[in-house]
Amino acid sequence: MAIKKSGHYGLSSFYAEQAVSNKLMVFCFTNAPAALAPHGAKKSLFGTNPICFGVPTGKVPFIYDASTSMINRGIIRRADKLGLKIPYGVALNKKGRITTNAKEALQGTQLPIAGFKGSGLAWMVDILSGVFTLSLIHI
């Protein structure tokens, strides 16, 4: 199933839990507005593009739910609101320098998990989301 013109759908594992409880395997993902720089870049090109995979496996299902960024954007927003620092190496400021300042990170860009591998996953999600829904691809 593909859903067009959707917004933030919340925690992906919520949907995976529903599927696996009905003995179904699920793979869900979505693209998002640019907030993630590809490996080696200093400007946002991809969204944080969450990925979720779930499989019923007996008593306890296997569910993997993660974004392609090193840290969830909501955590950065919360840190900004509370005046807290974010971990080193997860975001760049608008000048392309690593920052631990949440406000600067929100004005800059986030970094991908696993370097070029995370960039590849973000690109894959962006392309598949666009193709499956006949929608805009952000790249």
Task: List PLM regions with ranges.
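A long, hydrophobic alpha-helical segment
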Residues: 100-115
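Short, well-ordered loop/turn and helix-capping segments at boundaries between secondary-structure elements
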Residues: 127-134
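Conserved phosphate/anionic-ligand binding catalytic regions in large, soluble enzymes, centered on
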Residues: 113-121, 125
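A generic, well-ordered mixed alpha/beta core segment in the N-terminal half of proteins
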Residues: 1-58
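Short, hydrophobic/aromatic alpha-helical segments in well-folded domains
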Residues: 14-15, 109, 127
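Conserved small/polar residues in nucleotide/adenosyl-binding loops
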Residues: 137-139
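Phosphate/diphosphate-binding glycine-rich loops and adjacent basic-rich segments that engage nucleotide
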Residues: 35-103
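Structural motif
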Residues: 1-2, 23-28, 50-52, 60-63, ...
